Amino acid sequence: MAEIIGIDLGTTNSCVAVMEGGKVRVIENAEGSRTTPSIVAYTKDGEVLVGASAKRQAVTNADRTLYAIKRLIGRRFDDNVVQKDIKMVPYKIIKADNGDAWVEVKDKEGKSQKLAPPQISAQVLIKMKKTAEDYLGHEVKDAVITVPAYFNDSQRQATKDAGKIAGLNVKRIINEPTAAALAYGMDKKKGDRKIAVYDLGGGTFDISIIEIAEVDGEHQFEVLATNGDTFLGGEDFDLRLIDYLAGEFKKDEGVDLHNDPLALQRLKEAAEKAKIELSSSQQTDVNLPYITADASGPKHLNIRLTRAKLESLVEDLVERTIEPCKVAIKDAGLKVSEIDDVILVGGQTRMPKVQEAVKNFFGKEARKDVNPDEAVAIGAAIQGAVLSGEVKDVLLLDVTPLSLGIETLGGVMTKLIEKNTTIPTKANQVFSTADDNQTAVTVHVLQGEREMASANKSLGRFDLSDIPPAPRGVPQIEVTFDIDANGILHVSAKDKATGKEQSIVIKASSGLSDEEVEKMVKDAEAHRDSDRKFHELVDARNQADAMIHAAEKSVKDLGSEVSADEKSAIEKAVNELKEAMKGNDKDAIEAKTKALTEHSSKLAERVYAKKGGAAGAPPGGEAEGEPQAQAGGKKEDVVDAEFEEVKDEKKKDEDK
């Protein structure tokens, strides 16, 4: 069976891994990094940039550079957390027709295009898919994608949609802390252990209590409880620092940088860099020359920042992570002292203040043998290997993070499945009508812990009609909730008297319709085709440039030996090629390049002969001859060096 890759689709960074020959390999991207910034940029030329290239141009293209999109996935525009984010990001968050939070960017014609968060996240997944394909040498179709444990049903569904848009068959959605536990526990076979996975990433916080046990020779990972906050992460730490720096600058210079998207983007980059530096040093300088200007001239920002100051700015954010830890321990039915190991996941856990808070709560140092940036992708790859059958002795028992139920008489939520129930699971309950002769009931599906229905997350609603008229309380309506292994909910309602049944797979009451997802899949495929054509055009231009350089160099080297006719023909061919390069017609550029090659090939041979090519080139002659060899089309003389990558595992064996 083909490999199933593991993807950690993160708020700030993403990572991809695959299991090969029993070992998990985290795959480097085209830039040589093991993690890729989860940033997507739409340039003024219509190109889509993903990762480091998108991050590099963020300052000059702030309103089209989209980051932390995971915080919007599966969210309503009117959510308080979304409203808070709108004020802090340089790009435009809008209300979609279905009430979701979407993003608006300008296309290359300057027209507004509306993008759904799954559509943007799909671009990051396409990059991860391509990274894996480049390494494996063949197409990849199947993937396991991770989500925060505390993601609700609509956020999970939106993540699955993103995978589909990216051309991936999402075999499983698994929780990030569970994946990290797999990465940690796979090679630890002795005895039962209870571990706490504290996952503070770029945009979300999760805590999971997991028991690792040996059961009948199987390595069993059972999630006992999970809790968290899907709008608390490193981005919030950055925002505190940005606000502080902007406030200090306003005090000194009287200018509010929040009103300047360009300055705000530079400030964001500087704040992130300063935060990282303060994890290893006690103080740092934030120095941004020419950050803005007013009538009196340019303004420069130069502020000294200490670790103590940063810690005071984010103290309450660190404290906010402790309450979910208390709830998770209580829900797991354990005491803090019964936790054997604490695993830290997510880049923000590198902050000493966070590590100190974790140590104070759990009464022990966290493990340092898990890479916080890579553990989740490694765990996803292990789960992929379990699903493909490559790994056979692992059983993963995950849970649903929030209770699920329906709205009943008086606006009350009646729970059918309690939080922290092991999935997959199924539950049913019989309800009845509230009025005499009622012929239809509306099943309103809810997710959350509050008694009042309106205070919980609405996942969707559907009607069961054609109920035979009867006094209230007589009809028997059986409602069944079925959660699959991805944590996605299927609900059905059945009239026991008539056998009539109505069911839905819960998509968020917002969410993308199947038609919208299919359209986005086609758009993404079309974009991949246009990207391929763009790269082919760039290659053609590069070859044309090299040909022009080689031809002009040949004319210069031969000097008076070039006849007027030859010179005129080459100049004409060069000018025609330069004209073709101004356009976007790849075929025209290639045709003119070929014409110039034919004109200049004889000159190239004469240059080579003149420099001693015929009588044996002097030292250095080969290097000088390279462009001419190209120009003359003598490719058979140039042999590409063949090499193969030595895999880490082989290398280790050789070193022994």
Curated annotation (Swiss-Prot):
Induction: By heat shock and acidic conditions. The modification Phosphothreonine is found at residue 204. Acts as a chaperone. Might have a role in the infectious process. Residues 620-632 have a biased composition (Low complexity). Residues 607-656 are annotated as: Disordered. SUPFAM superfamilies: Actin-like ATPase domain, Heat shock protein 70kD (HSP70), C-terminal subdomain, Heat shock protein 70kD (HSP70), peptide-binding domain. It is found in: Cytoplasm; Cell membrane. Belongs to the heat shock protein 70 family. This is Chaperone protein DnaK. Residues 647-656 have a biased composition (Basic and acidic residues). Keywords: ATP-binding, Cell membrane, Chaperone, Cytoplasm, Membrane, Nucleotide-binding, Phosphoprotein, Stress response. Pfam families: HSP70. It comes from the Bacteria. GO terms for cellular component: cytosol; plasma membrane. HAMAP family: DnaK. It comes from Coxiella burnetii (strain RSA 493 / Nine Mile phase I). GO terms for molecular function: ATP binding; ATP hydrolysis activity; ATP-dependent protein folding chaperone; heat shock protein binding; protein folding chaperone; unfolded protein binding. One of its GO terms (biological process) is protein refolding. It is a peripheral membrane protein.
